[in-house]
UniProtKB/Swiss-Prot annotation:
Residues 177-205 have a biased composition (Low complexity). Changing residue 335 to W: Found in a patient with autosomal recessive hearing loss; uncertain significance. PANTHER family: ETS, ETS DOMAIN-CONTAINING PROTEIN ELK-1. It holds the Pfam family Ets. GO terms for molecular function: chromatin binding; DNA-binding transcription activator activity, RNA polymerase II-specific; DNA-binding transcription factor activity; DNA-binding transcription factor activity, RNA polymerase II-specific; mediator complex binding; RNA polymerase II cis-regulatory region sequence-specific DNA binding; RNA polymerase II-specific DNA-binding transcription factor binding; sequence-specific double-stranded DNA binding. The keyword Methyltransferase does not apply. Its main location: nucleus. Glycans are attached at residue 381. Residues 121-149, 165-205, 228-358 are annotated as: Disordered. The modification Phosphothreonine is found at residues 336, 353, 363, 368, 417. Interacts in its sumoylated form with PIAS2/PIASX which enhances its transcriptional activator activity. Interacts with MAD2L2; the interaction is direct and promotes phosphorylation by the kinases MAPK8 and/or MAPK9. Interacts with POU1F1. This is ETS domain-containing protein Elk-1.
């Protein structure tokens, strides 16, 4: 016997075989009732079939309860060891193969394309929870019917149409991007689409090129006035940093000026420089940003040819002033003694500028005869020596003549030995 046979099929086989009347027998063949004459022997034979030597009737009865829910076998009440096949006529009509009862035959009505004989075998196995395999040589024919029914189902429209329908929706997504991309390509004035992926970045590049083309135009059209030029430079710098940097060539002073802006010194520059006259304010800002456009370079070079040469000398000075407080911190002003002391000592008033002209030619922006107290405060706070030098007192009393007379003597010492300029205990 095949070990894959279910329990109800095993009992039906025992009932049909001759010579098993001493262990199992029909009590009502027409009604499908049978009795386990020797329940323990039946359980032992079932254990041998399943390779379980410890099988007994208790385990066999629990296994039979599984078929109660399946409506295949039920216990006859009031009689011990008596069971009944729920739909025995269908079971008796089968051949050597054990067929499922009536509830399983109703399943065939839902699948008209499959042969009824094959359904008797396959669903019966699914009901029992075990695969249907032939019990012996006589089972080979029904097994072949089961395979043929499966092949018929595979060839039937239920399976093939489902597979074809699942594959049909896939081709449409490919032409859909192709239809959308040609419409986007003329809008962005890009090249003709060579592929769905190659044409997608073209509108973005066109937009970026349009933005790059628009940014230099804004710089060229700016008026040469000092306050407006500074405000427009501040607006253009973040835009240039946000757009493609390769279009804009920025020299060293601009990069360090942006670093100083991050440390909080650019706002002071915007407050102090608009007070400088336009003639000297424009050359002071020109080294900050240098563009590749020929129109801007030619315009400023034609307007101020004599100013373009001193820019090279002013570049380090414009950068060291905002960066010196954060990098040096006051204790070590030896790197820029001239610029630090000059910026802190020239600030008090216009009376000191003629005396310091030969010693401070590298900072012409500070030599304005019309410097105001806000600019004095700006240069005194940015110089590394000013917070500790008596120059801060000159800012607190800009109108006093005694402070202006006292500063030149200290400035001479500051130029030679900058360490002497920090005698006060004031904190930076």
């Amino acid at each position: 016997m095949d070990p894959s046979v279910t329990l109800w099929q095993f009992l039906l086989q025992l009932l049909r075989e001759q010579g098993n009347g001493h262990i199992i027998s029909w009590t009502s063949r027409d009604g499908g009732e049978f009795k386990l004459v020797d329940a323990e022997e039946v359980a032992r034979l079932w254990g041998l079939r399943k390779n379980k030597t410890n099988m007994n009737y208790d385990k066999l009865s629990r296994a039979l309860r599984y078929y109660y829910d399946k409506n295949i076998i039920r216990k006859v009440s009031g009689q011990k060891f008596v069971y009944k096949f729920v739909s025995y006529p269908e079971v008796a009509g089968c051949s050597t193969e054990d067929c499922p009862p009536q509830p399983e035959v109703s399943v065939t009505s839902t699948m008209p394309n499959v042969a009824p004989a094959a359904i008797h075998a396959a669903p019966g196995d699914t009901v029992s929870g075990k695969p249907g395999t032939p019990k012996g040589a006589g089972m080979a024919g029904p097994g072949g019917l089961a395979r043929s029914s499966r092949n018929e189902y595979m060839r039937s429209g239920l399976y093939s149409t489902f597979t074809i329908q699942s594959l049909q929706p896939q081709p449409p997504p490919h032409p859909r991007p192709a239809v959308v991309l040609p419409s986007a390509a003329p809008a962005g004035a890009a090249a003709p689409p060579s592929g769905s992926r190659s044409t997608s970045p073209s509108p973005l590049e066109a937009c970026l090129e349009a933005e790059e083309a628009g940014l230099p135009l804004q710089v060229i059209l700016t008026p040469p006035e000092a306050p407006n030029l500074k405000s427009e430079e501040l607006n253009v710098e973040p835009g240039l940093g946000r757009a493609l940097p390769p279009e804009v060539k920025v020299e060293g002073p601009k990069e360090e000026l942006e670093v100083a802006g991050e440390r909080g010194f650019v706002p002071e520059t915007t407050k102090a420089e608009p007070e400088v006259p336009p003639q000297e304010g424009v050359p002071a800002r020109l080294p900050a940003v240098v563009m590749d456009t020929a129109g801007q370079a030619g315009g400023h070079a034609a307007s101020s040819p004599e100013i373009s040469q001193p820019q090279k000398g002013r570049k380090p000075r414009d950068l060291e002033l905002p960066l010196s407080p954060s990098l040096l911190g006051g204790p070590g002003p030896e790197r820029t003694p001239g610029s630090g002391s000059g910026s802190g000592l020239q600030a008090p008033g216009p009376a000191l500028t003629p005396s310091l002209l030969p010693t401070h030619t590298l900072t012409p922006v500070l030599l304005t005869p019309s410097s105001l107290p806000p600019s004095i405060h700006f240069w005194s706070t940015l110089s590394p020596i000013a917070p500790r030098s008596p120059a801060k007192l000159s800012f607190q009393f800009p109108s006093s003549g005694s402070a202006q007379v006292h500063i030149p003597s200290i400035s001479v010492d500051g130029l030679s030995t900058p360490v002497v300029l920090s005698p006060g205990p004031q904190k930076p």
